[in-house]
Amino acid sequence: MSDYRLHDNSTVVIIGGGPGGAACAIKLLQGARASGLNLRVVIFEGKDFSVHANQCVGVLSPPVEDVLSGELGIQLPPSIIKRQIFGYRLHGAHENVLLTGHGATASDIRHGRATYAVERAEFDQFMLDRARALGAEVTESRVTGIEFVRDGSLDEVRVYSESEYERADVVVGAFGLDEAMLSVFEDVTRRDGGYERPSKWLKSYLTTIETTPSFQTEKLGHIVHAFLMPPGCPRIEFGAITPKGDHTLVNIAGERVSSCDLDLFLRMPEVQALLPGFDPARINYYEGRFPSAPARGAYGHRYALVGDATGWLRPFKGKGINTAIITGARAAEVMLAHGVSKRALANYRKSCSDLRGDYRYGVMVRRLMMMGARFFLDPMIDVGKTDPLMYDALFDSVSGHDSYRNIIKRSLKPHLVRKVAARVFSGLRRYKALRAKRMPDISIRKMTVRDIDKVLRIDEKITGKPHAAYYESKADAYISRGPEYCLVAEHLDRVVGFVLGDVRGWEYAAELSGWMEIIGVDPEYHGRGVSRALMTELFARFKRAGVTVVNTMVNWNDGDLIDYFRANGFERGEYVNLVKNLAEET
């Protein structure tokens, strides 16, 4: 049985010149050139990208940069990048957390890849121009009909448009969720197994608000603000505020949302605090949609669908640009390697098993969020502030950096379930109160140089290692510079704990603040309120010095230690430490 291989002078027609269609054309022409094949690629695109708006947020997230460079040999030009995105702030009803991807998987290279906000029309034009430069013919016309001709020895595709007529060996549908083209494909493929459009989708509405660079730097920086199931907006599943340099994009999505829900979202105090003043009557709304269920029959004899038309997107964070580029490139690879028959194109479906396989996990996450977000989201955010595994799960869910399957696999840990349950059923106050027991006869006083040996012995009991030279120099320096902030705790004239603090400012552009450098408690006195007594006294002294913020540093992977500081009022700060491994340099 023939697989109908592409040959010299074969014609491939691609309907749609967006990222999926352009990626398919680029991969086809690159592959044909590498194998010495003379291939004709025709792209039909009815939009003028300089005029028509694309109802898409326009965020390029990993691994799209790797796909562009590795698969298509394309480097993103700086001119189309409006802003690099360094993180997301997830908002619940009462809690919020800054998510930068540096949690339990901080060493994973995937979490170091860049995310960019781009102008979709400019990105689409850039991709189409690259396809044209490789030899793709671009016809600026809308396709009106398709005909699959199988009559004796004649087996071809005929494509009709408002201006041109083409005969092709295969047709690629890269038209998104265009109603007219969806209907055309469903009608003409019905006898051959049949394409059926995605059965479910989410509606989206977006608007752009002009902002000055200074306002955006002050209010948003390089952070996308994400709102899951925002209170007061029951139909909104997801809302976001995305900085784009010269303007800010606001969008919402949900199965039953309308433009009135965007009105409600823009009136939320938390949203208005992130936007400049604007006249609601003078801003434009744009309507769009993206699939939340897979299509059926996304390939067949001499045809393949790519991008949104496949429905092979994440149910929550769709990553539509990524899916379009990846499916477009993979469809091209399969056509070149295997052919354009239905049997040959079955390899296209197999090559996208990673996209399709994640669907049921995404549905599970979406249903859980729909049922319990308003009840569980705040406790999950609260746990995520101190637990790296939960932090990563929230980051990956919002950013789309990892599959839902991996998110669920990493997150279903007994200790996470217990922590969330503790927040839900006991409440944060009781959670903190359980740690607040204190012995009544603990006294706090200033540390002296005579206490250094006692501090050293406590540290050795904690760590099992001697640090005599370190503590002698460290403690002496702190006592000399700020004796008010170096304290010891005594019980019956025995030193049972210590803390070294300092007041300094303008490091990393931070205001004057208190620093809690080291705190230690004799293991025999753990759980008796010694550390809380030390911190209470230290913080009181900081306040008398005019300090309003206290800093400390811990290993992000030490969940128990982070839990401890969280119980004592510490939150994850705005700064993230960056490291460079000089040993890896050649």
Label the model's feature ranges.
Residues 48-94:
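N-terminal FAD cofactor-binding segment of flavoenzymes
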Residues 449-450, 457-511, 517:
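Acetyl-CoA-dependent GNAT
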Residues 29-54:
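Glycine-rich FAD pyrophosphate-binding loop
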Residues 81, 235, 256-335, 340-342, ...:
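FAD/FMN-dependent oxidoreductases across multiple families
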Residues 336-437:
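C-terminal helical "tail/cap" subdomain of flavin- and related membrane-associated enzymes
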Residues 521, 527-540, 567:
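Conserved acetyl-CoA-binding loop-helix of GNAT-fold acetyltransferases
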Residues 542-554:
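Conserved GNAT acetyl-CoA-binding A-motif
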Residues 27, 130-275:
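Predominantly flavin-linked oxidoreductase catalytic cores and closely associated redox partners
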